[in-house]
């Protein structure tokens, strides 16, 4: 179950680009260990979502252009799970906020209260 990066046969080995567990290794600006080679999206660690790749692309290109962008803050990018009903989230988990000593409010919403969750 899951997504496998499509990195076979695209020349990464010949260039010497570092790969770990089916993902291209990059820094916070999506530079690989090979100068001039960058990677974003589904082939780097992180959520495999189009809007995540878009944020990574903006950061990467701004860095290439010398614009000194802030690294992508993945906690500010919405995430989703395409189930029925759908599940979405944004921000840190409760555990992450606790570990960082950040004041937070946690909410719960029971599926039984959602008409979409109980309709067949």
State the predicted function of each range.
Residues 6, 43-120:
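Mid-to-C-terminal Rossmann-like scaffold of FAD/NAD(P)H-dependent oxidoreductases
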């Amino acid at each position: 179950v899951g997504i496998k990066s499509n990195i076979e046969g695209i020349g990464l080995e010949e260039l010497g680009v570092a790969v770990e567990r089916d993902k291209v290794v990059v820094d916070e600006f999506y530079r690989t260990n090979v100068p001039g080679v960058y990677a974003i999206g589904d082939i780097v660690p992180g959520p495999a979502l189009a809007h995540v790749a878009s944020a990574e692309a903006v950061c990467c290109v701004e860095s290439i252009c010398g614009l000194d962008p802030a690294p992508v803050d993945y906690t500010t990018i919405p995430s989703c799970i395409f189930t029925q009903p759908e599940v979405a989230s944004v921000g840190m988990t409760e555990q992450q906020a606790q570990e960082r000593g950040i004041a937070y409010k946690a909410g719960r919403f029971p599926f039984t209260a959602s008409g979409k969750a109980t309709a067949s």
